[in-house]
Amino acid sequence: MKHDPQFRALTPKWHQGYRFQYEPAQKAHVVLYPEGMIKLNESAALIGGLIDGKRTIAAIIDELHQQFPNVPELGMDVDEFMEGAKKKNWIDLV
C-alpha cells in the first residue's frame, strides 16, 4: 500500500470480542477471539501492542520509528498489518 495520509489518520481498535495478549503456553503474543486464537509473529506483536483505540496509525508508525529508526519500510509494514487485520475483522478503524 502506498502511503495514504487519510488511512494513517484512522485509529485502530480491537474488534469486539477480540483481545491482544501474551500467551505463555505459546511463548508469543496472540489475538484471542471467541472461536480461537491467532499466534502473532514478532513484528505483528510489536504493532498489535500499540493498538489501544487512542493512537492513530500514523502515531503507531511514529512510535515504532523511534524504536527502530533504521527500518525505512516500517510504515508500509504497519499499513499492511492494519489492512490485513481489518479484512480479517481483528480490528476496527475509526
UniProtKB/Swiss-Prot annotation:
Repeat listed as a keyword: no
Signal peptide: none
Pathway(s) where this gene product acts: Cofactor biosynthesis; pyrroloquinoline quinone biosynthesis
Cysteine disulfide partners in this protein: none
Domain of life: Bacteria
Keywords, sorted A to Z: PQQ biosynthesis
Record-stated family: Belongs to the PqqD family.
Protein name as catalogued: PqqA binding protein
